[in-house]
């Protein structure tokens, strides 16, 4: 039976752990002692990127480790190596190998709320309008749960809880939530609407203590998020991964849509529209005159999220990426954090420590990629080339990596001289168009990583194409060929 984490936080000096053990949810607190490395004159197990020996220093608490880093920051000749995002040190220590996870053992909820609109669209900032209903779909068991402030006939498969006041509804919802806390919460724009509205409304109606009970650790923190210059509110609910399907769709699909409303995206991807209520004058008229249809409208939103996931597997993609990198699920939105952690794990496997973190102010502009200026005119036989995984291949081609970079730039390198093949290049180095030079006598860790990831991508791309051929080709011969093992 497998053991895997679902969420790990570092609160002060304490690890807050949630995960699955042998199919059952587990949750605990524990202390953590981070490890850093300093230069050593003796032969040691771990080395720096440049090959220097380093010795480990284990600290009693994360606070003491941070104080040590600050104490020697800027001290000439004293280097403190090691990954400073300590929570990922703990993950690696507890899960050193490949993580054997099972999505079907997690609690993954799709959430949608409906709110009164007595004075236009409800304002999250004030959370002054009463909540009318809450619907959750467990995307693993496929069960529905609806809380409502009026009676309705629940569709088949929906467990309904009916109350006469918002206060009663919220009390029951929070009690149920505490007994069924999800590992992942999703929905459409829940990060900037549903979750902050619930949190602010509960805080307003029941008090801060009840609001913080949304978190299994009693930790729910508000933060400001600016979107196109407009201030929004989001909540970090400790222990729960909020993976907004709206954000996942924007990040992992590569076509621009004319609208990102759920109604439009569901039509584009599923051929289905949300329940139409245009016969009513406004939203208030809708829930006042046809409560049954209104609740079906609420329930349909979480059903659409589940159908989108069945087709697109964006949650599954985020989960897979997170376990590959050994990060939390929400980290998929941060490319820097994902890559930093992947590099940390890759180097640690090879007994190499992460170099000291350098903070630089961006006070200068950097030249972008070279773009050849087109010459206007009429041309025959025009072709277009799309290079496969261009940036990774450039990194591999030029052996681009921190430890292979040479301090001196090539004195005569320019784009034009390289294109005209008039530049003399010493065979000991790779020379880039901007004059940067990279050693060739050692293989950099970054191109090694790129090659490994690209090889895996090639294997799974072929498997995907074979699967597509199997299900779309009418030819028995093609179907037979698709079952043949890939040579990759």
Task: For the regions a language model picked out, list residue spans one by one.
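Conserved RNase H-like, two-metal-ion catalytic cores of nucleic-acid enzymes
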Residues: 3-10, 14-44, 95-184
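Long, highly charged low-complexity segments
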Residues: 49-109, 113, 118
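Short helix/loop capping segments that flank catalytic or ligand/cofactor-binding pockets
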Residues: 118-121, 145-146, 196, 251-253, ...
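Short secondary-structure boundary/capping segments
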Residues: 125-128, 196-209, 397-404
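Active-site-proximal helix-loop-helix substrate-binding element of RNase H-like nuclease domains
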Residues: 144-147, 154-160, 164, 181, ...
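Common nucleic-acid-contacting/processivity interface regions adjacent to the catalytic cores
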Residues: 281-402, 408, 470-473, 479-481
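Helical catalytic core of nucleic-acid polymerases
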Residues: 381, 387-473, 479-481
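Hydrophobic alpha-helical segments, chiefly the membrane-spanning helices
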Residues: 482-488
């Amino acid at each position: 039976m497998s053991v895997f984490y679902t969420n790990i936080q570092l609160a002060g000096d304490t690890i807050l752990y949630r995960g699955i053990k042998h199919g059952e949810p587990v949750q605990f607190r524990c202390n953590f002692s981070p490890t850093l490395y300093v230069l050593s004159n003796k032969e040691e197990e771990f080395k720096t990127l440049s090959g220097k020996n380093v010795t480990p220093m284990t600290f009693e608490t994360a606070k003491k480790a941070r104080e040590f880093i600050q104490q020697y920051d800027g001290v000439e000749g004293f280097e403190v190596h090691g990954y400073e995002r300590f929570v990922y040190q703990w993950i690696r220590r507890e899960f050193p190998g490949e993580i054997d996870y099972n999505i079907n053992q997690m609690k993954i909820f799709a959430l949608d709320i409906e709110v009164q609109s007595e004075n236009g669209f409800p304002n999250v900032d004030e959370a002054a309008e009463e909540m009318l209903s809450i619907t959750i779909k467990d995307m693993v068991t496929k069960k529905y749960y609806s809380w409502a402030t009026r009676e309705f006939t629940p569709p088949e498969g929906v467990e309904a809880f009916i109350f006469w006041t918002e206060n009663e509804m919220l009390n029951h919802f929070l009690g149920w939530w505490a007994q069924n806390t999800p590992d992942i919460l999703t929905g459409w724009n829940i990060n900037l609407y549903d979750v902050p509205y619930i949190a602010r409304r509960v805080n307003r109606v029941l008090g801060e203590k009840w609001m913080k009970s949304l978190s299994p650790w009693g930790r729910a923190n508000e933060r400001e998020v600016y979107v196109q210059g407009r201030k929004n509110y989001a909540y970090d609910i400790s222990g729960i991964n909020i993976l907004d399907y709206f954000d996942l769709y924007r990040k992992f699909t590569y076509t621009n849509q004319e609208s990102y409303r759920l109604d439009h995206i569901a039509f584009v991807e599923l051929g289905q529209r949300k329940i139409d209520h245009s016969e009513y004058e406004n939203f208030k008229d809708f829930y006042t005159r046809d409560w049954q249809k209104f609740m079906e409208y609420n329930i349909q939103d979480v059903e659409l999220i589940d159908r989108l996931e069945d087709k697109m597997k964006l949650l599954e993609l985020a989960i897979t990426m997170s376990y590959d990198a050994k990060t939390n699920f929400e980290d998929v939105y941060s490319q820097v954090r994902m890559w930093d952690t992947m590099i940390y794990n890759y180097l640690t496997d090879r007994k190499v420590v992460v170099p000291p973190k350098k903070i630089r102010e961006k006070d200068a502009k950097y030249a972008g990629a070279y773009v050849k200026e087109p010459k206007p005119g009429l041309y025959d036989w025009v072709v277009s080339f799309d290079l496969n995984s261009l940036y990774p291949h450039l990194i591999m081609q030029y052996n681009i990596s921190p430890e292979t970079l040479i301090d001196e730039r090539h004195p005569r390198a320019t784009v034009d001289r390289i294109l005209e093949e008039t530049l003399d290049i010493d065979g000991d180095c790779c020379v880039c168009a901007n004059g940067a030079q990279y050693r060739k006598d050692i293989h950099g860790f970054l191109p090694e990583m790129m090659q490994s990831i690209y090889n895996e991508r090639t294997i799974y791309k072929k498997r995907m194409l074979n699967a597509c051929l199997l299900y779309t080709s009418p030819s028995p011969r093609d179907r037979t060929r698709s079952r043949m093992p890939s040579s990759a």
